[in-house]
């Protein structure tokens, strides 16, 4: 699902809200979450999951074009851990 599909879906469920208002709310929510993660905070949304930062240690990579070894510095990367309710809901889907 893309952001525009999410906006369409929410606009269908909440006809009293304009798609523009929904888009602004989604952008604001994503902005707040991004700022919190950039500040090192953990975000927990009960029933959905949590976002946190994980440390990735430095390593030696390889340039795929030249085959040359390249030193990659350590970095923090966003990590999502799904909550129990989300895991259960996804696992209940029949293939």
UniProtKB/Swiss-Prot annotation:
Transmembrane segments: none annotated. The keyword Flavoprotein does not apply. Residues 52-95 are annotated as: Disordered. Keywords: DNA recombination, DNA-binding, Transcription, Transcription regulation, Translation regulation. The keyword DNA-binding applies. Residues 82-95 have a biased composition (Basic and acidic residues). InterPro entries: Hist_DNA-bd, Histone-like_DNA-bd_CS, IHF-like_DNA-bd_dom_sf, IHF_beta. It comes from the Bacteria. One of its GO terms (cellular component) is cytosol. GO terms for molecular function: DNA binding; structural constituent of chromatin. GO terms for biological process: DNA recombination; regulation of DNA-templated transcription; regulation of translation. PROSITE patterns: HISTONE_LIKE. This protein is one of the two subunits of integration host factor, a specific DNA-binding protein that functions in genetic recombination as well as in transcriptional and translational control. Belongs to the bacterial histone-like protein family. Heterodimer of an alpha and a beta chain. This is Integration host factor subunit beta. The lineage of its organism: Bacteria, Pseudomonadati, Pseudomonadota, Gammaproteobacteria, Methylococcales. The gene is ihfB.
């Amino acid at each position: 699902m893309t952001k525009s599909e999410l906006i369409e879906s929410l606009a269908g469920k909440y006809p009293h809200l304009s798609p523009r208002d929904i888009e602004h709310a989604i952008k604001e929510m994503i902005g707040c979450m991004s700022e919190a993660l950039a500040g090192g905070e953990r975000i927990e949304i009960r029933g959905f999951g949590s976002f946190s930062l994980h440390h990735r240690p430095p390593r030696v990579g390889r340039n795929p074009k030249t085959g040359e070894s390249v030193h990659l510095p350590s970095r923090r990367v966003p990590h999502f851990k799904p909550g129990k309710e989300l895991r259960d809901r996804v696992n209940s889907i029949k293939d």
